[in-house]
């Protein structure tokens, strides 16, 4: 679209823009167009930018200044152009003046009764606004919908938008009482963005330049006030003061909240901003942060806080309590209530103190539980020493319950001399002859009632010199002693310090008895495995019960049973001296009697007041028992000892009764019993087996050769004679050992020419074939059933034959 030439002010005629001759050539080509005649000042738009920087006036916009300084009868060179000048007379096609201000003045009804005006023309002189402000004609086919109401001029519309904030402040009403916090924030953002926006001098569209400055000329936005749910927003976005019937009371409470906002909302956290637009996720995140921060409350202030909150609940107003606390002054202002963020918000929203009281009660109960747990752990712990008891005594006044902490001594059954050994166990402590009643003596007396003194000796080789290093290597004993040392804190133990980490316990040589032993070895109930180390060589003792560990090595073991003060494990002398079974004429070894030693001090001897040696029997060898199972048998052992069973009585083994009579099952003949006397060995030597004597021991080939008399009798007759004399047993007679051995030998000899491993018959039957019933197919109307068992390393196969008339029965059924 072309532009019509225009004249320029003579003051600007000397100023030529760069490339003006190109614009002149372009304007000459477009001078005959319709748009150049409609918008005769379009060509001069590029002159406006230059004039804006040099001749800027705050009252008149730059474009208006440029239009006022131009004359439409002059071109860009300052010369009059006769061929491009528009006739100023009346025209039949176009209006003489296309300015919108004149149309608005005469109420022209064209363009759907709409009045358009440039925002820069507001307040300008009348001679400057007569030129049209269109830069483009817009769409060729414009569609305009007629409306009943007319749109006023933008200048009139801008002046009608009154700042409601200023009016509310004049009336004494704060502006935040009229709108919600989200609307306030939106309004504030719009005002800030409009205040920072400035008109750009490089804008080329008058439509955009007309729409944006409307915000710059207004100081506020009028937004309709909505107050749903009949509640007033307080100074915070999440707090609301519900309306009361008494307006004076509600206004006073609102003023009171605003005055005490600093004291009440000291812990408001991230929810304290009044211009924050809240949603569900933002509220949850804020609550989490407040709860994490409020959870770190000092527990020492809980008692005072509970009293302060209970006083506040009686008054029924948290704000009044806060003011009273501020007036009281002193150190009470430093304490804060340990309430959660949720309870605090509910209190601010609804004035409800139920959740806050519940939080306080929960915190108080948690503190009480923690204190009671500390008391129980201090009273029941076996690791507490005398020094720790003194510290608990000093702390007793601080505890709220005021319990007197005293050490508890467990009761253990003790064998009494004057009473029967089958009576119920009683508590009895051992008297120790010591001059000082120190803490260590009390601990050792308590420890002696719990544990048992074990006497371990090395008796195998009495020639071991005193200079030899003899140790006991036992992980079980070392762990038990380490646990005792941690419990009793005994630093003056007679054992090595290495046994805390090394399972080696040094043995002491006794010059009087010429033996090695372990002094003062107190162990709890259980099973212990050990080995002896003599000059670095591990071995086991034959005087102690033996067993094998998981690697197959021989180890010694012994068991400590509850209810005894002293035990000395050893094996029976009968097992050590000889492993031969006693004959009937010899007297069986008796169980060793109980040895009792006089009461003495623990430090003077390793025997205690009720020393009892509990020997082990060959029937009680180690078979995979564990310490836990032995400890669990404590109650059962005590009940068994109190019963009527005599555990210490002599064991009477059963005497075996022998007989010389042969059962009828093994008799061969007419059933007459044959008695064999023990004193008839010198009568005469036994006859060899024959047809008439000991036929079971005869060889089958020799027996039938004798019956046939050198071939005079055939085999069938000899078999009939044999069957007439001896009845047919369960198994055929040809299934004797010699017959089977001959078959096996022949099969092995035949397989020597081939591969021996594949053809040889394995005499060892797989265990999967043992104790299984095997059968064969029916042949010659006979079925056989067999079963193989193993007895003392040998295999015995029993075969049972039975007639099976299968074909005969089938033929009878078919007939």
Swiss-Prot record:
Skewed-composition ranges (Basic and acidic residues): 12-31, 72-88, 120-129, 587-596
Record's comment on post-translational modification: Phosphorylated by SNF1 in vitro.
Phosphoserine: residues carrying this PTM: 33, 181, 198, 200, 206, 209, 220, 331, 494, 497, 643
Protein's UniProt keywords contain Coiled coil: no
Ranges of Low complexity composition bias in the record: 313-326, 377-389, 433-444, 599-608
Ranges annotated as biased composition (Basic residues): 363-376
Keywords: Cytoplasm, Lipoprotein, Membrane, Myristate, Phosphoprotein, Vacuole
Highest taxon of the lineage: Eukaryota
Lipidated residue numbers (N-myristoyl glycine): 2
Gene Ontology biological process terms, A to Z: signal transduction
Region annotated Kinase-interacting sequence (KIS), chain positions: 473-716
GO molecular function, one term: protein kinase binding
Region called Association with SNF1 kinase complex (ASC) domain, residue ranges: 724-804
Protein's cellular compartments: Cytoplasm; Vacuole membrane
Family statement: Belongs to the 5'-AMP-activated protein kinase beta subunit family.
Name under which the protein is recorded: SNF1 protein kinase subunit beta-1
Organism encoding this protein: Saccharomyces cerevisiae (strain RM11-1a)
């Amino acid at each position: 679209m072309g532009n019509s030439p225009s004249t320029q002010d003579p003051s600007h005629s000397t100023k030529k823009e760069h490339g003006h001759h190109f614009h002149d050539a372009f304007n000459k080509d477009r001078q005959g167009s319709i748009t150049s005649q409609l918008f005769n000042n379009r060509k001069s738009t590029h002159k406006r930018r230059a004039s804006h920087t040099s001749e800027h006036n705050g009252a008149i916009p730059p474009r208006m200044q440029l239009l006022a300084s131009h004359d439409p009868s002059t071109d860009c060179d300052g010369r009059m152009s006769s061929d491009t000048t528009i006739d100023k007379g009346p025209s039949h096609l176009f209006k003489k003046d296309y300015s919108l201000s004149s149309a608005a003045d005469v109420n022209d009804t064209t363009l759907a009764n709409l009045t358009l005006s440039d925002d820069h023309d507001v307040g300008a002189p009348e001679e400057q606004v007569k030129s049209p402000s269109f830069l483009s004609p817009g769409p060729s086919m414009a569609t305009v919908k007629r409306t009943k109401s007319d749109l006023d001029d933008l200048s009139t519309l801008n002046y009608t938008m009154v700042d409601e904030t200023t009016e509310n402040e004049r009336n004494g009403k704060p502006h935040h009482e009229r709108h919600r916090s989200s609307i306030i924030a939106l309004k504030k953002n719009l005002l800030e963005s409009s205040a920072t926006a400035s008109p750009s001098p490089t804008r080329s569209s008058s439509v955009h330049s007309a729409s944006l400055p409307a915000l710059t000329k207004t100081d506020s936005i009028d937004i309709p006030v909505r107050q749903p749910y009949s509640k007033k927003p307080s100074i915070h976005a999440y707090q609301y003061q519900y309306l009361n019937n008494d307006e004076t009371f509600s206004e006073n409470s609102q003023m009171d909240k605003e005055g005490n906002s600093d004291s009440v909302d000291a812990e408001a956290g991230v929810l304290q901003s009044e211009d924050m637009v809240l949603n569900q996720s933002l509220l949850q995140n804020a609550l989490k942060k407040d709860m994490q921060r409020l959870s770190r409350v000092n527990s020492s202030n809980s008692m005072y806080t509970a009293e302060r909150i209970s006083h506040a609940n009686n008054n029924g107003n948290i704000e009044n309590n806060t003011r009273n606390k501020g007036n009281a002054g002193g150190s009470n202002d430093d304490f804060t209530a340990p309430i959660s963020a949720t309870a605090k918000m509910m209190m601010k929203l609804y004035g409800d103190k139920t959740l806050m009281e519940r939080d306080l009660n929960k915190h108080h109960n948690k503190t009480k539980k923690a204190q009671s747990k500390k008391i129980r752990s201090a009273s029941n712990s076996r690791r507490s020493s005398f020094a720790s008891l003194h510290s608990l005594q000093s702390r007793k006044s601080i505890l709220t319950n005021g319990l007197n902490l005293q050490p508890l001594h467990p009761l253990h059954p003790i064998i009494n001399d004057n009473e029967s050994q089958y009576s119920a166990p009683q508590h009895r402590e051992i008297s120790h002859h010591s001059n000082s009643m120190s803490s260590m003596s009390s601990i050792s007396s308590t420890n002696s009632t719990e544990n048992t003194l074990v006497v371990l000796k090395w008796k195998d080789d009495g020639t071991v010199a005193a200079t030899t290093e003899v140790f006991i290597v036992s992980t079980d004993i070392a762990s038990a002693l380490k646990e005792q040392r941690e419990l009793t804190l005994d630093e003056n133990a007679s054992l090595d310090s290495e046994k805390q980490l090394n399972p080696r316990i040094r043995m002491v040589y006794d010059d009087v008895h010429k033996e090695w032993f372990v002094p003062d070895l107190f162990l709890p109930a259980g099973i212990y495995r050990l080995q002896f180390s003599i000059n670095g060589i591990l071995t086991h003792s034959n005087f102690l019960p033996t067993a094998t560990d998981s690697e197959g090595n021989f180890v010694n073991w012994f068991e400590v049973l509850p209810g005894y003060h002293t035990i000395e494990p050893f094996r029976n002398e009968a097992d050590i001296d000889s492993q031969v079974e006693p004959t009937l004429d010899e007297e069986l070894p008796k169980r060793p009697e109980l040895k009792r030693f006089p009461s003495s001090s623990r430090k003077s001897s390793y025997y205690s007041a009720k020393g009892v040696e509990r020997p082990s029997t060959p029937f009680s060898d180690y078979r995979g028992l564990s310490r836990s199972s032995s400890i669990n048998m404590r109650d059962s052992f005590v009940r068994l000892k109190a019963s009527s069973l005599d555990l210490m009585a002599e064991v009477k083994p059963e005497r075996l009764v022998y007989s010389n009579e042969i059962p009828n099952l093994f008799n061969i003949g007419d059933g007459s019993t044959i008695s064999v006397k023990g004193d008839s060995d010198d009568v005469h030597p036994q006859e060899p087996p024959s047809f008439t004597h000991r036929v079971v021991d005869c060889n089958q080939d020799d027996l039938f050769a004798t019956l046939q008399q050198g071939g005079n009798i055939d085999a069938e007759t000899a078999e009939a004679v044999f069957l007439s004399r001896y009845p047919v047993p369960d198994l055929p007679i040809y299934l004797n050992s010699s017959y089977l051995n001959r078959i096996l030998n022949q099969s092995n000899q035949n397989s020597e020419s081939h591969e021996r491993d594949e053809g040889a018959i394995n005499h060892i039957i797989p265990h999967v074939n043992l104790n299984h019933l095997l059968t064969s197919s029916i042949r010659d109307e006979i079925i056989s059933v067999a079963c193989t068992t193993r007895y003392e390393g040998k295999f015995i196969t029993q075969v049972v034959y039975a007639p099976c008339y299968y074909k005969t029965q089938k033929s009878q059924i078919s007939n």
